[in-house]
Amino acid sequence: MWLNLREKLQSKTVRIEHPEVYECKFCGSDQIMRYGKKTKQLKQRYYCKACKKTFVIDTITRRMWFDPKVVTMTLDLYYKGVSLRGIQDHLNQIFNVQLNSPQTILNWIKKYEELIGEYVKTLKPTLSGQWQVDEMKVKFKGNWKWLWNVMDRHTRYLLASNITKKREAEDARKILALAKEASKGQKPEKVVTDGLHAYKDAFNKEFFTLRKPRTEHISHIRLAGDMNNNLIERLHGTKRDREKVMRGLKTEETPIVPMQDIYYNYVRPHMSLEGRTPAEKAGVGVEDQNKWLGLVKKSLEASRRPVLDNPN
């Protein structure tokens, strides 16, 4: 499988495109020529015959140490299930990019989780009105904990994820509160959960009101029909597959879980959505073919701050 993936990536990703440059950034002359690439960074360098200076084109990603497509391809490979060392080997063989250690990739994940995470929090997805809530066990340094998820049924948009040590009412309430915050004031018509008693107390504290219309809590899951939790259980299956490659999460503060949610919402196409992402279905998707790069660009534009990828 890895060999097939490598061949596919080789044919698709070795051509790193660069924007056309027509004049020197220093003197404005059109007497410019391509002048190789910056060492290990795969960024196109240009030489001006008029002023004898070399330069690299300025773009929205001008402060990224490595070529943005290399960085975003690395993120994509990781969330498609390739191990850190597998990615390190791929970058070396295909792009001649030599990373000192796999930790560099984790540093990229942390850096871009912060950047992209801040951006997506500002977006308001258009939701269907039915939320599905569930929890699953995950491992942190050999200890089992609980990963909670809330998904909008029809868009498949993942509203919130949270990790807790226990599975009590306050833990259930926390995930519902996070989902309400992410919905930007959109009140669900129904909240579907399993029969865990903690959900009843949590739901009443977060959603109960005397005013109509009221949000309905559906906690008895039937084996068939519109109200079952099969969709979010499929999401858990996806996360378990990713966990096998991650070999257990390392700490609650890891950026891997938030980035996995970003990958699920904004990057990964869904067959049930006719090849669209949940974000596209919810009206907040990225149009770029390279979804990761599109997210980075939009995040940089929104934050107006540089991001460095210096591995040292």
Question: For the regions a protein language model found, what residue spans apply to each?
Answer:
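A short acidic (Asp/Glu
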Residues: 143, 199-205
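Short, conserved DNA-binding cores of transcription-related domains
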Residues: 1-54, 58-60
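Acidic/histidine-rich, metal-coordinating catalytic segments
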Residues: 187-199
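RNase H-like two-metal-ion nuclease catalytic core shared by retroviral integrases
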Residues: 219-241
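Active-site beta-loop-alpha junctions of metal-dependent nucleic acid enzymes
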Residues: 64-66, 111, 161-184
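C-terminal domain-tail junction helix/linker
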Residues: 245-312
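Short glycine-rich loop/turn motifs
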Residues: 143-149
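Short, positively charged, Gly/Tyr-enriched micro-motifs
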Residues: 33, 43-131, 135-141, 155-157
